[in-house]
Amino acid sequence: MDVGRRRLLAALAAAPLLGAAAKKEPKRREPPAPRPSRRRKDAKPPEAHVDVAVVGAGAVGAWTAWHLVRAGEKVRLFDAYGAGNGRAASSLSSMMLDPVQGGDALYADLVDDSYDAWKRLSNSASLPILTPCETLTAPAAADTPAPPRGVDRESGVRLRTRFPQIAWREDEQVLRADKGAMIAGRRAVLETILDAQVEPETVVMPAPLLDKRRDLYVLPDGGTARGIVYACGAWLTELFPQILTPARLSAVRSLIFHFGPGQGDEQYRPPAMPAFVDRAYGFSLLPDVEGAGVRCWRSVPDASVDPDSFDRRADERALADTRQWLSARLPRLAAAPVVASAAAHDCRTATGDLLLDRLPGHPRVWLVGGAAGRAFSLAPAIGARVAAHVADPARAVESRWALERLMI
């Protein structure tokens, strides 16, 4: 047998073995489809002369600008420290969207529109902005809230099965809402501004200066605006000290702690863990998202502060109080390590309500602030309301949000 014939027979004998090896080789899997996202258009360069100047690039200011741009208005967005800065009330990593809103129908009616707006933004962002989670509210003894639409009452007995990581009293009656959410704080503000296609400007904006000859407001760089929205929260007292005294509107401090669950412990993450407003004990918590830990804080702020200068560090006394609450409500977390902490501020009015009204003597200048604990998550609906007022000067102001209520 010649060499060529031997090689041919050897090749034919090896062919079945090669085929078997090929069959055993696993199919190559295609990589998972990327998260749906759309490319955002770049922000347009600021124009000198615009329809509306928005002062304050927090959640309410960002959504006000967003709605104004969608309505066809030319907008400039100013913030003295820059959008999403560390001093802002909007700078925290997460915020709660609570459908219960303490049983207050005025704010509960803003939840659906806000949820939908945050969800649309989240669907177009590179990272999630809205994380759905159930929310629970344990009323205080003096509370008699009527459950808003979409909110049910649950007994402590049933909740022990659904959320065993929380200690429930058998006689507790808790308000449970399915359509709650956590909003990604500072990241959500920046995404809103990107989606509005407005370039935020780090500019210190003074009280309004009206050029009476042109009937336009003069901006710091010589530009003009037909109207101004001051959505700068606690900084309103610096701009309008004669109207908004500290007794009427102020920055209030909350001390926040993030507690880290153990390795592989997912019972403190959504959907296993809800957001929880414990009015019975005066504390609130948000579940662990993105590994940031379970966030806990006392629901009632502990002091009035200067938002420009107060120290953003939490203190040991507040930590001891928070651990005491955890030992009663979430005993397995009571000794968990603190993985992050901060002192943050929010803006509160004397009535506890939002302020949304015109500046006296300036029918095209709007003041927006207050509603501590609510304004961030409801910012899409609040911003829509502000934009509607700008478009329709005859639109009536919500009586509970009127400036005159603070002047009494």
Model-derived features: positions:
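N-terminal secretory signal peptides and thylakoid transit peptides that target proteins
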Residues: 1-14
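Dinucleotide-binding Rossmann-like beta1-alpha1 core, especially the glycine-rich loop
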Residues: 93-166, 170-173, 282-283
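C-terminal catalytic lobe of FAD-dependent flavoproteins
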Residues: 332-408
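Active-site substrate-recognition segment that forms the wall
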Residues: 67-70, 128-130, 234-361
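Glycine-rich FAD pyrophosphate-binding loop
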Residues: 70-89
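A conserved short coil-to-beta-strand element within the FAD-binding core of flavoproteins
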Residues: 201-216
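N-terminal Rossmann-like FAD-binding beta1-loop-alpha1 element of flavoenzymes
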Residues: 52-76
